[in-house]
Amino acid sequence: QDQKSYENFWQSNKLEAKGGSNVTLSSNKVNFTFMPVAAKITISINYASSGGATTKYKNVTATLAGNGIRTGASSSETIEMLHTGDNTVASDKHTFVCILRPGANMSFKLSVSRTLDGASSPEATQQTFTQPAYTFGASKNYVYNFTSSDELILTSVEVMGFKETTVPDNPVSAT
């Protein structure tokens, strides 16, 4: 699934109103609560300096591959991640996001392709990281922080809940 464009990324987000306790009727008004049904993966790569110079890359792409990571099917599926910055400008920092189907025993392989600043074609070898089986929960953002020289080096993983926002009592009036 191509989530490389902002439009495709946002179309992959899904909200659901679940359970009878979330939907109530009072005074000719229906009150309900939406809950995200997906998990978010954020990949942050900070390329290391070489000697005194900072190594910069452009046209960096990130892809996740794994069984059921989009639909829950038992077959292999891929997600092309959204690059959150201007991918045509060389930089030493790159961030990607995607929406992942939550579930138990989920694993994936991250593959990163990159072009060294000043080069005309991508490097021959992709950088990879394999996430072993893990339970990904809905409404969570899993932030993977990497440094890199020739390979991806995982420095931390943070799990954060989606941020809640307050909604005004009467945000939209039908009258």
What spans do the regions from the language model cover?
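Beta-sandwich strand segments
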Residues: A119-Q126
